[in-house]
Amino acid sequence: MWRYGLDMASLDWIGNGDHDNGGNREFSWWLVQKTTSLFTVPGAFEPMFTYERSVSYPSGHRNAMFAYRGVRPLPRIPGSQEKLFGTPEAGSPDIKTFYAYLKHFDGICASHTSGTLPASGNVCHCVP
């Protein structure tokens, strides 16, 4: 992937986007971190430290992105459906925790599969 982004596509950045950097397996996370650093060409190609955080309906998928190495994927909140997904009125505790984590580590995210129906008003899943 890195060689494609650097050579064939002539991109200036790319991110791995693996689901939780290999499902919280130590070697998978380390390998993504290491290869992201390895293929950096300052001023020409800046791979970003990214992963996809996939939570099923209604919370959806988000691609997390960080400018620096070493941020581990955020685990899901254990417990009931309500703890993970919340309610339409109160929002999702899991997503609120995720946005606090992004803020703490200076990260950003893109919601690419909201996991909600268009009429559900998933704007509530965004950072205010």
Protein language model features and the residues they cover:
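Extended, charged catalytic domains and RNA/DNA-binding interfaces, predominantly
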Residues: 1-128
